[in-house]
Every structure is written in C-alpha cells, then in structure tokens.
C-alpha cells in the first residue's frame, strides 16, 4: 500500500516531489529484491527506475516495462474515499476483496505484481530467465523523455521479449492477451473573442461568444453517422478484413451488460461497426474537457473572453499521430469564423501498435494463462494507448507481450 499512498500525478507540477518519492520507493523495492544495477535514471522530466537480475547470458532476457505515475483524481468529490488512502473492499466481482486506490490497476498494481512474482521465484531459486525492469514516471503524460532514454541505452535494455501489464482482460474468468493498441493524438484548442469578459446584457447578441462558437466547431467534427469530418483523417487507415472482424465479434461480449455497467441508455458510435470494433479497430475523437466563462457556484452573467477544449483522437494502424496533428490543426483553423481568433496546441501522442501472435513470447504467455485459468486466452485489441510500445519494437528490435490483468470494473482514469 505504501506505493499507492504516494500521489504521483505526473500531469501536475505540484506533485513533482511525490513522483520523485515514488521513484525512490521503487528503487528501494528493487534493492530489497536483491536486483542488480538498481538506479534512478534522470531525464529532463520524471526519472526512470531501472534494475536487473542476470542469471546467465545463455538464458533469454525479459524486459518488464511499467509506470509508477498516475492520472489526476479530479473531480475529487466523486470518490467514495481518499484515492490515495488504499483500502480493501469486497465486491460482487471480487468477493475475496479488491484494493481501491488511484493506480491500483493503472499501473502500480499490475507493475508491482511482477516484482512480487520475481520475489517468490528468487526465494524458491527457480527464476527461469534473466529479468530487467524499466519503470517510468511519465506514461500518463505521453512518455516524452522515454524515447531518448531508450535510444541512448539500447545495450542496457537489450532483451528477447518485452512484457507489459498495463492493459486488461475480458473478465475475471476469461483471460485475454492484447494484440493491438490504438495510437493517440492529444490537442488543445483556445478561442478568443473580446479582450475581456463582458456584461452579457450589454453585449449579448452583438459580440460572438467564444463558448458558443467552440461548441459549434466541436459539433461539426462528426457527421450524422458519427464519422470524423476532418479532411484526410481516414486516408491511411488499414481496414481490418471481414474474416478478422467476424472473429473479433466472437469475443464474449454482452451489450446490455456493457451499457448497465457504465449507466448508458443507448449505444453510440460510428455507423456500420459493432461496439467491440468501435472501441478497438476504429478511430475516435473525443472532447476530454471544455471550459470558459463562469463555472463556480451561483450566477455571473458574463460573455466570456475565451473558451478552451482538450481533444483526444484514438488512432488505428496506418495513421500517424504527427500527421493527424497537422490535419486537425489545419481543419480547426479553417472552420474558425472571423469573429474569434484561434490557437491550437499539440500535447503528447503515440503510434498505434499491432502485435504478432506467432512468437515464442506469445506462446509462453498463452500457456501461462492456460495453466492458471484452464483455458486458452483470447487475442483482443485494446482501445487504449501506450505511446512507447511502437518505439520499443523499432529501437530495441524485440516484440512486446501485452499481458494485462485489469478489468472494466477497475474504472481506470475515472
């Protein structure tokens, strides 16, 4: 619980010391496990924690990647308890009890699971391979400094397979291995109208309201079939074959249970695709936050000077996040009326990734699941993004096994 108690929110500067504390605690755990070459590797941002246990150069080497930073917890009033005060509660899904805290699944809990596994194997003297750990503190803000670290430390990070547990599985009783991740493009739009907030009675109807304008612009980003309207957005999308689509839709999935679990009244998404397809093999564009004007309690009749929106786009194979950034920026500027000015800011992003299923690593992971669950895991594609995965394959020339244990009920990022 000690690691979960640290509010290592990488997105907020006021938590920089906490992020550092999490890195230092992780290093202590590495040393306690008797890992070798344990170190905190400095970057221009938050550090990377490294440790290894090399038994023999003749044995294969697994590189375990994870992250110790977490998402912001806002809005705090929607939490039942302090998100950084972990506790165990029995639930319908987990009658044995589950840990509740920010990061319990994403990714402190899943990452720490590997440390405990190594601990047991070292105690029993049956560690069957070499193991390296590379745990970063910036995954939730795009892994901006990990790319340079990987490029500068290829020999240190050399491996036969990369193991990542930062994804999920279908259910507690149905194991799955993630074979694909969507990419990400994260943008911010700022509109400016008048040079200050105005009296909505004196100026309403005569001055363009940036919030009204931004709302119309955002609404225009999808057509009536929920397809994204940015010119060129779908140009390089690699379509999934009908055979693969049919196989994908054989995955155990109940739409009514899906809706009930998150309080939906009706389905939503791009016409012509199932919910499973919409959340994995199709791109998506969503507003992550929108604000402007007066948003505190009570009333203040203003016509705001500015309006803001943060928008993320999930990408699929064939799309390049930097190209999508360019298309988005150009389109937003083209549809901005002359009554306001616009500023578009690029944040982080990453490429989509598809993993092969014919590797030794995949076979080993599949066998491990089968040994525990007495059934073969199902290969699935995940709608989320881990920006650095595609880079691993490019720079380290090794494949990644996305062996996650998270469940939808974990409500990560909520």
Place the predicted regions along the sequence by residue:
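N-terminal helical capping/dimerization or prosegment-like subdomains
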Residues: 1-76, 306, 323
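An extended, acidic, His-containing surface patch that forms the Zn2+-binding/catalytic region
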Residues: 57, 171-172, 229-306, 317-327, ...
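Acidic, glycine-rich active-site loops and adjacent beta-strand->loop/helix elements
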Residues: 68-70, 134-143, 165-170, 193-195, ...
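Flexible glycine/proline-rich, aromatic-decorated loop/lid segments
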Residues: 176-192, 402, 406
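A short core secondary-structure module
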Residues: 204-226
């Amino acid at each position: 619980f000690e690691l979960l108690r640290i509010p290592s929110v990488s997105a907020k500067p006021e938590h920089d010391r906490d992020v550092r504390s999490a890195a230092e605690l992780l290093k202590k755990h590495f040393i306690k496990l008797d890992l070798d070459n344990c170190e905190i590797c400095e970057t221009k941002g938050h550090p990377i924690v490294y440790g290894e246990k090399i038994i023999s150069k003749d044995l294969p080497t697994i590189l375990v990647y994870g992250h110790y930073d977490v998402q912001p917890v806002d809005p705090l009033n929607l939490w039942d308890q302090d998100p950084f005060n972990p506790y165990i509660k029995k639930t319908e899904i987990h009658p044995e009890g589950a840990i509740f805290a920010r990061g319990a699944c994403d990714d402190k809990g899943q990452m720490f699971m590997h440390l405990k596994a190594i601990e047991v194997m070292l105690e029993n003297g049956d560690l069957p391979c070499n193991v390296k750990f590379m745990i970063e503190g910036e995954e939730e803000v795009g892994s901006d400094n990990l790319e340079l670290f990987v490029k500068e430390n290829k020999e240190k990070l050399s491996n036969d397979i990369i193991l990542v547990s930062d994804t999920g599985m279908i259910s507690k009783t149905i194991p799955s291995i993630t074979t694909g991740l969507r990419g990400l493009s994260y943008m911010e739009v700022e509109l400016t109208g008048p040079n200050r907030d105005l009296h909505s009675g004196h100026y309403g109807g005569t001055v363009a309201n940036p919030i009204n304008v931004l709302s119309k612009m955002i609404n225009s980003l999808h057509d009536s079939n929920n397809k994204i309207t940015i010119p060129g957005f779908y140009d390089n999308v690699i379509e999934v074959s009908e055979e693969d689509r049919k196989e994908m839709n054989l995955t155990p999935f109940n739409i009514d249970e899906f809706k009930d679990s998150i309080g939906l009244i009706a389905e939503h998404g791009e016409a012509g695709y199932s919910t499973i397809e919409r959340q994995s093999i199709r791109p998506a564009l969503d507003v992550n936050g929108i604000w402007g004007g007066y948003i505190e309690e009570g009333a203040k009749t203003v016509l705001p000077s500015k309006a803001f929106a943060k928008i993320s786009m999930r990408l699929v194979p064939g799309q390049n996040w930097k190209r999508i950034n360019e298309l988005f920026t150009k389109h937003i500027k083209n549809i901005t009326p002359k009554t306001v000015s616009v500023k578009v800011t690029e944040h982080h992003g990453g490429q989509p990734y598809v993993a092969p299923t014919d590797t030794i690593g995949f076979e080993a992971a599949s066998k491990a699941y089968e040994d525990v669950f007495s059934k073969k895991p199902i290969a699935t594609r995940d709608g989320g993004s881990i920006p650095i995965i595609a880079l691993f394959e490019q720079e380290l020339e090794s494949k990644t096994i996305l062996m996650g244990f998270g469940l939808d009920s974990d409500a990560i990022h909520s």
